[in-house]
A protein has these predicted regions:
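Pyridoxal 5′-phosphate
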Residues: 1-317
Length: 317
């Protein structure tokens, strides 16, 4: 299981730990942090809400959270550079925003963090499985992702990547028996952390989610992420072009290279429209002012045409 995910992000299995969700994985990571003079966590409002919630929870332990506001649904490395400095403990970036599919330049954002001797954390939930990831080339320190979205799995399984050079420097407080060298040691009077990223593990895994997700990971690896990326770019391009032709406005990037596997259209009553479309067998997701479609490699141009035309029809009523 760990080796499959590690292969997907170009890491080693020893740098990967399974968790229950990105929320729990990120929380486990931050539970290893101490906040002294370097107490600032930099994050943006383009992240999925859980990241903002988890870092705000660190304020009771001395963290100071700095939130970057997006400009027209995007944030750039310069936005991070303006607010990082000698007090920065961690820079948090979302690889692909669930709001509109914007792809952040995680390599450049990581350089911003490293230039001030800080570290970079990446939420890759919306990119893993559809956008190629190489944690070594991108110089990523920490990364999380889950299997529910583009990895074709179930809720209940996520992964935390920790760069091997950092593992032994961190002693998390949010742990369980799987975090120890000997998980079966009864009556322990001191902690004996695993030497690998397993030290960030907690308790018993969600076994049904695990087995389903193993199959999903194998499918993605067999299909190949570069191939998936190429197909999805064509489908999202089709969605944007057709939507504009039908009078829809999108908050997703027009540049194919800046867009992940989703397109968000601005519609009236997004949540209500989501429910109406679901009843018709068209699965979308309302996020803020937008209604999001998120094709995968198994979708077809006909699927896109049907969905976008129906969205335009309902929005015109």
């Amino acid at each position: 299981m760990k080796s499959l995910f590690a292969k997907l992000i170009k890491a080693s299995p020893e740098e990967v730990a399974p968790h229950f969700s990105v929320s729990s994985a990120f929380g486990a990571l931050l539970s290893a942090f101490d906040y002294g003079r370097r107490n600032e966590i930099v994050i943006s409002d383009m992240e999925y809400p859980t990241s903002n919630h988890v870092v705000l929870g660190q304020e009771k332990f001395g963290a100071n959270v700095i939130t970057i506001k997006n400009r027209n649904y995007r944030v750039d490395p310069d936005d991070y550079r303006k607010v990082t400095g000698r007090k920065t403990r961690l820079v948090s970036a979302v690889h692909v925003s669930s709001l509109n599919g914007f792809i952040e330049d995680i390599r450049s954002i990581g350089k911003v963090a490293h230039d001030v001797n800080s570290e970079v954390y990446v939420d890759a939930y919306q990119s893993v499985g559809n956008v190629p990831i190489d944690v070594k080339k991108d110089d990523v320190d920490y990364l999380t992702a889950g299997t529910l979205k583009y990895l074709l799995g179930l809720p209940g399984l996520a992964f935390l990547y920790v760069r091997k050079e950092l593992i032994k420097e961190l002693e998390p407080a949010y742990i369980g028996w799987f975090s120890q060298k000997d998980p079966f040691q009864f009556g322990a009077e001191k902690l004996d952390y695993a030497d690998t990223a397993d030290r960030f593990q907690s308790g018993t895994w969600a076994i049904p989610a695990l087995y389903t997700s193993i199959t999903g990971l194998k499918v993605i690896l067999k299909e190949g992420v570069p191939s998936i990326r190429e197909k999805i770019m064509k489908l999202t391009r089709q969605a944007i072009d057709l939507g504009m032709e039908l009078g829809l406005r999108t908050i997703s990037p027009q540049n194919d290279q800046e867009r992940g596997a989703m397109v968000s259209f601005v519609v009236r009553e997004p949540h209500e429209m989501e429910n109406m479309l679901r009843n018709e067998g068209i699965i979308t997701s309302s996020r803020g002012i937008g209604l999001r479609i998120a094709p995968h490699f198994y979708n077809t141009p006909a699927d896109i045409e049907k969905a976008v035309k129906r969205i335009a029809e309902l929005n015109a009523r």
